[in-house]
Amino acid sequence: MEGRLPYDDFPVVFLPPYESPPAWVPPHERVYHPDYNNELTQFLPRTVVLKKPPGAQLGFNIRGGKASQLGIFISKVIPDSDAHRAGLQEGDQVLSVNDVDFQDIEHSKAVEILKTAREITMRVRYFPYSKCLLAPNLVT
């Protein structure tokens, strides 16, 4: 088997746990039923602005980057931090920071941009299933 990776060298990808579908609800009752939410605004891109005093932490961790081919994602948000109060959440994909595209950026470059900026304008979108696909996190 020349040219092929040994089985143990393949990356491990964990899928989210299976969720049983909710009980069937007639279509005319779905509008008001709590198990049927057609509100998609939580998945639309949004802007988050953070100001970081010198020496302070941002209040969140990131994962991913160009090597993972998945983009940069928020892997953890510290409760009661400025990032938490600004609306960042675990599973947010970072689309850009201060007009720098983060969708195809090296992890180290993303960390450098986030750590050196004093005022950060982030464009993010919520993508919850990214949490199960990402490499170990890095505190920023």
Curated annotation (Swiss-Prot):
User: What InterPro entries does this protein's entry cite?
Assistant: MAM_complex_regulator, PDZ, PDZ_sf
| Organism this protein belongs to | Gallus gallus (Chicken)
The cellular component terms of Gene Ontology attached to this UniProt record, alphabetical and capped at eight, are: basolateral plasma membrane; cell-cell junction; cytosol; presynapse
Provide the GO biological process annotations.
neurotransmitter secretion; pore complex assembly; regulation of synaptic assembly at neuromuscular junction; synaptic vesicle transport
GO function terms (MF aspect): protein-macromolecule adaptor activity
Q: Which gene encodes it?
A: PDZD11
Annotated localization: Cytoplasm
Q: What is this protein called?
A: PDZ domain-containing protein 11
The reply on keyword Protein transport is no
Q: What residues does the PDZ domain cover?
A: 47-129
